[in-house]
Amino acid sequence: MTPLIFVTGGVVSSLGKGIAAASLASILEARGLKVTMVKLDPYINVDPGTMSPFQHGEVYVTDDGAETDLDLGHYERFVRTRLSRKNSVTTGRIYQNVICKERRGDYLGATVQVIPHITDEIRRCIDEATASFDVALVEIGGTVGDIESLPFLEAIRQVRIERGAERTMFMHLTLVPYIAAAGELKTKPTQHSVKELRSIGIQPDVLLCRSEQVIPDSERRKIALFTNVSERAVIGCPDIDVLYGMPLELRRQGLDEIVIDQFKLSGTASLADLSEWEDVVDAIKHPLDEVTIAVVGKYVDYQDAYKSVGEALKHGGLRQRTKVNLKWVEAQDLEGSDMAALKDIDGILVPGGFGDRGFEGKVLASRYAREQRVPYFGICYGMQAAVVDYARHVAGLEGANSTENDRQSSHPVIALITEWRTTTGEVERRDEKSDLGGTMRLGLQEQRLKAGTLARELYGRDVVGERHRHRYEFNNRYRTQLEDAGLVIAAKSMDDTLVEMIELPREMHPWFLACQAHPEFLSTPRDGHPLFIGFVKASRARKAGGKLLREVCV
């Protein structure tokens, strides 16, 4: 059985369970262990695919097309294991599975209850996602004490009874607040949080104590005494200035050794080599250049909606020792044709989105970048905005639009995808009446790049795979007309039916590229992504007056 580390949170939400868990996973991976991660989310939605970005933030997409919590993005940025729909489990999915089994008669007429049926299904999902790994980390969303989390906590309590301490570990993340008026850290919230956890039968093995300051040894001893946790296993997690430095901090305090000792993995695990993370932190702390990128979106008041985009831009910068400053621009603010927000920036990125609100602002951002020769990177809706701009203002297709926003458009250059092949080769069909949830073109899809294009130069190969999440697509009826007007179709699906990337000729624009997929989902701090690296480099070149001041790469 795979050893399991269950990560829970207490006192308040948003303490960073996902980052802490992913950081530990990265250390264990660096020790030669095969690691995976699972997120258990207590909400009743089947997945976050139809949830508002203002409430939930980004919907992260895996290779197999699962629409998941943004924490899976953190996981994949810290560990090299590629995750799937098995790694994201919600209350909605659990209940859906149980109800389907009940309807089929799988329970043989039994009364279906939270215990054992719901908890058994939770345990089955955990087992399915973690089989064949050396270690798995399972994060339980929410905060201890939330009624929604109780079935998950009961399920992991049962797992501990079944597997024992040598195959399970409970890691609890709490807050140790600093009270300025008293001038001291307070441990009482942590004590009460552990008391709440123990009341449902779970005794933490490790405490991760979040705080603004370093926790003194005297306070760590106090926490250990009142929570029945070894002092060695009370780990301080002070605020740090570089997120990707967390693996180094946890390694310094020996968290991985606690795991290795409890699971008796010393014969399997090697010494941790965290040199890659040291290089990442060094590149972030000591940049040699700096650029400002305008991100023109429609959810900019809640930047978690673009979490992977922001991180991918920073990754693209750190691969060149360049600090990337993000200027968040509300797309609607551009619709009065006031482009002041786009002055004095080095590049423009237009990310994905849905619906007509703000779309015209994105079109205007594309036009501004095209006419002012500012590096432009369009992603998903950002590509569609670029196509609409080009159709209207270069190809002369007055009224060109997406049918998502105007079904009566005289020139629907972007239209609903009605048919495509999935990753398994099956044909899927959709229409305007299809359910919103889980009905998009989703997951990793291969595409063929056109020789001689900027895209082909950046990737360095002919065929690439990127993750998708969209319903609307470039309308092939206008492909020839737009190409005749100068637009370059830089990539198409493997069956030649779907336009995947567009760009402008380099004699027309120094760097103008847009893609229908979401490359941000494959960017990591250790490797970056070719498109983001190229975009940041082009932005540096613009800032330098057409040529790079420094050619640096880590």
Swiss-Prot record:
Keywords: ATP-binding, Glutamine amidotransferase, Ligase, Magnesium, Metal-binding, Nucleotide-binding, Pyrimidine biosynthesis. It holds the Pfam family CTP_synth_N. Homotetramer. Residues 292-545 form the Glutamine amidotransferase type-1 domain. Mg(2+) binds at D71, E139. One of its GO terms (molecular function) is ATP binding. CTP binds at S13, D146, I147, E148, K186, T187, K188, P189, T190, Q191, K222. Catalyzes the ATP-dependent amination of UTP to CTP with either L-glutamine or ammonia as the source of nitrogen. Regulates intracellular CTP levels through interactions with the four ribonucleotide triphosphates. ATP binds at S14, L15, G16, K17, G18, I19, D71. It comes from Xylella fastidiosa (strain M23). UTP binds at S13, K186, T187, K188, P189, T190, Q191, K222. It catalyses: UTP + L-glutamine + ATP + H2O = CTP + L-glutamate + ADP + phosphate + 2 H(+); L-glutamine + H2O = L-glutamate + NH4(+); UTP + NH4(+) + ATP = CTP + ADP + phosphate + 2 H(+). This is CTP synthase. The lineage of its organism: Bacteria, Pseudomonadati, Pseudomonadota, Gammaproteobacteria, Lysobacterales.
